[in-house]
Amino acid sequence: MQNQRIRIRLKAFDHRLIDQSTAEIVETAKRAGAQVRGPIPLPTRKERFTVLISPHVNKDARDQYEIRTHKRLVDIVEPTEKTVDALMRLDLAAGVDVQISLG
């Protein structure tokens, strides 16, 4: 697996959960002997929703909600077979979306 890299993108609503997951990935990759670049924080996506709280009158009465999607990027440069096996066995939290690409 020479001259390859593994790019891991993580998404989560809870920033503590995503930081914990990236720390586990980085620690596992370093223990397996790979060179790691990251975690790189990507821009957080903020979605805002405005809801009318009055069913009939009082148009100015509204509630606003927001949900934030936190993202991180981890690059593993020149991974070995041991690194890939260790990452495959890694069990991450349920609230984290993981996308892996080889390049």
Swiss-Prot record:
Keywords annotated in UniProt: Ribonucleoprotein, Ribosomal protein
Keyword hit for Ribonucleoprotein: yes
Keyword Cell cycle in record: no
Entry GO CC: ribonucleoprotein complex; ribosome
GO biological process: translation
SMART domains noted in UniProt: Ribosomal_S10
MF (Gene Ontology): structural constituent of ribosome; tRNA binding
PROSITE patterns recorded: RIBOSOMAL_S10 (PS00361)
Pfam family membership, one: Ribosomal_S10
Subunit and partners: Part of the 30S ribosomal subunit.
Family to which this protein belongs: Belongs to the universal ribosomal protein uS10 family.
HAMAP family in alphabetical order: Ribosomal_uS10
Function in brief: Involved in the binding of tRNA to the ribosomes.
Name recorded for this polypeptide: Small ribosomal subunit protein uS10
Protein species of origin: Haemophilus ducreyi (strain 35000HP / ATCC 700724)
